[in-house]
Each structure stands twice: as C-alpha cells, then as structure tokens.
Amino acid sequence: MALVEREHMKEDAGRLSEATAGDFIALLKPRVMSLVVFTAFVGMVLAPANPHPFLALISILAIAVGAGASGALNMWYDADIDAVMARTAGRPVPAGRIAPGEALGFGLFLSAFSVGTLGLMANWLAASLLAFTIFFYVVIYTMWLKRSTAQNIVIGGAAGALPPVVGWAAMTGSVSLESLVLFLIIFLWTPPHFWALALFKEGDYERAGVPMMPNVAGAASTRRQIFAYSVLVAVSGVLPTAMGFASLSYGAVAAALGVAFVWYSWRVLAAKGQDPALRPEKALFGYSVLYLFAIFAALLCDGLVERFGA
C-alpha cells in the first residue's frame, strides 16, 4: 500500500494552533523519554567518574530535552502516517491540536538547546553524541529507514541505544567498551520489542504503508527472528558480569531475566499466531518493556553498591 500523501499536512504547516501545555508535553513522547533518561542515568552512574551533582543534574536534563526534541520532530514528520493508524491518530499533530510548523519549530529549538547546554556544561563529545542521536533518529530512521525497509527497527534502533553512551561520555569525556555493552543490550532488545508490537498491530502499519517485518517477510518469519534476537538479548544481558564491570549478583538477575525473555519469545514462536487474540505476542511486548527497565535497574543497583558500598 502506498504511503499516505503529505499534502494535506503541508497546507496547515504555517497555521497557529490553540494547543495546551499538555499537548506540547505529549509531543515530547514522555514514556519514551522516561526510558531514555533512565538508561542515560545508569550510564552516568556506572561511569568511572565523580562529577559534581549539579553537573550530573544538568547533563541528565539536557539528555531528556534532547530525547523530547527527537519525539517532537518525529511526530512532525510522521503526522501523515500517524493520522491513519489507530494507535497514533490521537497524537497532537494528526489530531490537529498542534500545527505542523509549531511542532517543527519546537523540536528544532529543543534540539539546539539540549546539545548546546550539554556541550557547555559537560563536554562537546557528549554533546556531539546527543546531536548524532537526534539526527539519526529523525533523519536516518524517521525520514528514511522507517518508510523504506523492513530493517527500519534494526538499524534505527541505534538511536534508542545511544543514551547510556551519551550519559557515560557526559561524565568521563570518553566512550568505553563498557558503555558500548550498554548500547548493545538496548540495540539487540529493540527488534523483538517492536516486532512483537507489529505482530498485533499489523493492520495499522499496513494501512499506513510502513514496511514492518510482519508486512514484508510474513508473520512466521518475524516470529523466528524475534526468537533469535531474544537469545542474543539474553546473552548480552550477562556481558557486564562476563566483562568484569558488574557483580555475580547482577549476572544472576540478568540471566533469570534473559531466560524469561527467551521463554516469552518461544511462546510466540510456538503459538504460530493461532491465538486469535495474539496473547503471546502481547505478553512478550509487555515483558520486553519490563525487561529493559529491570536489567538497567539491576545495573544501577549494582553500580550504586560498588560506588557507595553495601
């Protein structure tokens, strides 16, 4: 199916809306922002540095604003396809509560503000990584990959995986192998998380013409790939212990969480879509959100114990 035409969105690009503060908050994708902030904070805590608390606070706020800027620019560009998807039709731009031009200006301002603040208050390596993250998510993923390939989530997942690296760099002025392991955990987690969603929202993506894996390769192939990635997720989760920058206690927690992730994925594979309500797919999607918060919470606790003692 062809992508929805953007012309009707362009016609309203210059008008002013009567948006509320709540609409602009929604434009920032606060749920996504919360995950970005949390993983970035974990990267900051695990980094071998002792920054001033004020620097840490400003850094995490700048990263949060940068994440919100990405969300605003994504909603600006994707308003045409959001309008025809039941899951996203109520977002501020397609619903007409915020004009496209306002969303664009808001996103650009927040992007510049967040990058500039992080550069001036922390260091320009972290600011450059934040700028790259915003660019990659908005231009590479949103404007290109999302509408052109079923590998959109795989490649585009790099943007969502970078926040802990940005947080680490903000504290140390460098990028380390440990921070890249944090990146890897999120990068490998992204495909099974979003493909589980795509399996029970397949009609939405098909109507919008977005080439998600189930629409392109079929549901059976998607289930096999979900399972394969889930095994990799489980392995990546224990790497911090294997590499010596997390404790055996963390490793045990990560292993248990990873086994559960594989089990949920196996249920999706074994069900073969025969459950009309797609309960295994919905269960995996829900657990995947819990998994990422839990694995980074375990890393955070481990890092705090290491830093301050038991």
From Swiss-Prot:
Its EC number is 2.5.1.141. CDD domains: PT_UbiA_Cox10. Keywords: Cell inner membrane, Cell membrane, Heme biosynthesis, Membrane, Transferase, Transmembrane, Transmembrane helix. It is found in: Cell inner membrane. Coiled coil: none annotated. GO terms for cellular component: plasma membrane. HAMAP family: CyoE_CtaB. Belongs to the UbiA prenyltransferase family. Protoheme IX farnesyltransferase subfamily. This is Protoheme IX farnesyltransferase.
